[in-house]
């Protein structure tokens, strides 16, 4: 997954690989995709697929006819789009895993039960909650006592790197394969996750302890400071970091953001327009 992300214009914010499934929080890096030159697009695509005879000639530096240029430019536009497509990213990743598993088991046929499921995260609250939900998979499954003891998770990789770093919140001292934590920037669209790495690690550690100790109705008063900045009630936070997938359907974020992003549909039985997922977002993230 991490190696494939280097080829695609997809950033990995969080991941957890379990025994029979995996979770990932992904960021589409449109600026990176648009900034690629034509030859860079072709080179990246050839790391994934064979491309075409014309694209192979182009990469070798051979002269092309005008009709070949027309065809190549059309392919480059399509490949540039695919390099920042989560669908194509997951398609390639699942194909690779299935091929390796089938080779290991010496069999053929379908490896995955169905297509992957995805949800759009619209704001910092939704992002933080989903990342924590993903990173805490092994803790919830009682496979690890703490996030740092878990295997094959982004939080373990980040925590190990942070212990070695002189300044763990500095982007250049964070895990290079993962999307950086950008601190608490004032601008609306920071380059990275809009919080400090150390705050997130503290938040996930605290959340993991609450889950492990099953503290329902007796939440510790020592809540991480970032909880107050995010503006999420502690009980709601603990609930959604254990039930994110079942609680939210589709787009996740503040109610006004969700309403502006997702399409409404007509419910003929109740004769009113409704928006999927609004109730859960209003209850848990307001």
Name the predicted role of every residue range.
Residues 1-286:
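Short catalytic/metal-binding and nucleic-acid-binding patches
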């Amino acid at each position: 997954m991490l190696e494939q992300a280097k080829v695609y214009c997809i950033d990995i914010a969080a991941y957890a690989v379990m025994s029979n499934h995996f979770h990932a929080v992904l960021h589409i890096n449109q600026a990176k995709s648009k900034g690629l030159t034509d030859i860079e697009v072709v080179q990246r695509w050839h790391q994934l697929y064979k491309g075409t005879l014309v694209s192979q000639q182009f990469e070798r530096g051979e002269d092309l006819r005008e009709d070949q240029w027309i065809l190549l430019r059309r392919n480059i536009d399509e490949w540039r789009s695919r390099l920042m497509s989560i669908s194509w990213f997951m398609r390639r990743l699942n194909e690779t895993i299935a091929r390796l598993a089938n080779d290991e088991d010496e069999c053929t046929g379908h490896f995955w039960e169905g297509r992957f499921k995805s949800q759009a995260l619209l704001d910092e609250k939704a992002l933080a909650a989903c990342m924590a939900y993903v990173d805490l998979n092994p803790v919830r499954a009682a496979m690890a006592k703490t996030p740092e003891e878990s295997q094959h998770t982004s939080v373990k990789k980040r925590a190990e790197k942070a212990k070695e770093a002189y300044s763990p919140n500095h982007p250049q001292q964070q895990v290079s394969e993962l999307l950086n934590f950008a601190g608490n920037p004032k601008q609306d669209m920071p380059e990275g996750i809009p919080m400090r790495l150390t705050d997130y690690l503290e938040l996930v550690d605290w959340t993991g302890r609450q889950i492990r100790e099953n503290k329902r109705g007796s939440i510790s008063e020592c809540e991480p400071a970032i909880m107050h900045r995010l503006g999420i009630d502690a009980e709601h936070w603990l609930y959604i970091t254990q039930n994110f997938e079942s609680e939210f359907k589709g787009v996740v974020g503040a109610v006004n953001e969700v309403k502006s992003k997702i399409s409404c549909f007509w419910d003929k039985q109740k004769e009113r327009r409704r928006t999927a997922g609004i109730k859960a977002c209003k209850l848990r993230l307001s």
